Amino acid sequence: MNFMKNSLFQRNLEQEREEEMPEEGGVLAVWGSPSSGKTVVSVKLAEHLAKKKRNVILILADMITPPLPYLCAPSDIEQERSLGSILAASHVTENLIKKNCMFYRKNDYLSMVGMLKGENVFTYPPYEKEQAAELLQLAAQIAPYVIVDCTSNIASDILSAVALMEADTVLRLAGCDLKSISYLSSQLPLLSDHKWDADKQLKAVSNIRQQEASS
């Protein structure tokens, strides 16, 4: 991430024009049914913002199948740090997040937070919702855009559940198959409480196969 973006030594006319544009960022949680393309959409959105020279943090919440090892080569990452190190702390701080952000060498405006290859939910001590909330709140202070790639298992994934509650906007994805319908029928009742704020959810159909689109 280009933390030096506003430095006098880094400023040029193009950046000044960019900075004149209002920032309308926030925290976006991408959530939905299994195989609905949550990670792909999250990465594409983060990549688009980074190409527009917008600082963005992509938080990859999956601890069962960490996405980072299959998203980019190790050589594309400036330093390997783990999401687990952040959540294992008794209190999350801004400095702790910065130390554990993985910087993407191909674009200074994109950094990622996620589990590393070989790590899983038992690699680090269990965390509570307080650490997850602190991570999201402080990440939003570091970068104007924060995208959380949530898992589908919100009943046991604390970070994804907190992201759905704390995010400014939730992008809810669903596929055109019976599995997605079954998933939403099962999980949406869990979000009926007002704390989930269903009104902030943007609904989209994604990962549509050719035969599904024509049917």
Across the structure, where does each feature detected by a protein language model lie?
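Conserved catalytic-core segment of NTP-binding enzymes
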Residues: E134, A140-Q141, Y145, C150-S215
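N-terminal regions of ATP-driven nucleic-acid and macromolecular assemblies
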Residues: E16-M21, G25-V27, Q79-C101, L178, ...
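Anionic group-transfer/hydrolysis microenvironments
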Residues: W31, D62, L116, T151, ...
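Phosphate-binding loop that captures ATP/GTP phosphates
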Residues: K52, V56-S111
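Hydrophobic/aromatic beta-strand patches that form the interior of the parallel beta-sheet core
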Residues: L28, I57-I59, S111-V113, T169-L171, ...
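Walker A/P-loop phosphate-binding motif and the immediately C-terminal alpha-helix
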Residues: E20-L68, A139
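Cytosolic-facing regulatory segments adjacent to core modules
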Residues: L96-K106, M112-I154
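Extreme N-terminal, non-catalytic leader segments
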Residues: M1-S33
